[in-house]
């Protein structure tokens, strides 16, 4: 799902509410994908409790106002149908909070493709490799060589590498913009 509109809207709200300097569009887009505290820490060079305050403001706004402003990528339903038809087990490993991810995937009908979904915890203690591992464990797959992580960011690629599964990078998401980025 392309969650750009909702994420950027919630980031702008958080910035305004906390009196932070406004950002250009290119910098706002950097908030899409990584854990929200990491994005605020990197962008504003912040640390400590303020990051949790910013994350709480963002999450409340995103959940209550901006969550469903997402759009499915072109042909994604067709791809999912083909995977299911070929008995491919599908799971979702995301840095979105699990409750948000469940709501958004259900809203857009992706829950018919998988019941295996794990996301970030409220305090962002889980790394991507932890989230991927939970998906694999829940799927019943025991041989990690049978697993492929499809993702659009360095976080996805590193998480897959750290747990020992293959990775396919895609450029239609937020992180990788071209084939060179994937390498």
Model-assigned labels for residue ranges:
Residues 77-85, 136, 157-161:
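Surface-exposed amphipathic alpha-helices with a cationic face
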Residues 1-30, 85:
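Active-site neighborhood of HAD-like aspartate-dependent phosphohydrolases
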Residues 41-78:
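Metal-dependent phosphoesterase signature
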Residues 148-183:
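Acidic, Mg2+-coordinating phosphoryl-transfer loop and its flanking beta/alpha structural elements
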Residues 111-126, 146:
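A short, structured active-site edge motif that brings together acidic residues
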Residues 14-15, 35-49, 104, 135-137:
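Helix-loop "lid/cap" segments that line or gate small-molecule binding pockets
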Residues 128-157:
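Conserved Lys-Pro-Asp/Glu-containing loop-to-beta segment of HAD-superfamily phosphomonoesterases
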Residues 4, 11, 76-105, 120:
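Substrate-recognition element of Asp-dependent hydrolases with the DxDx(T/V) motif
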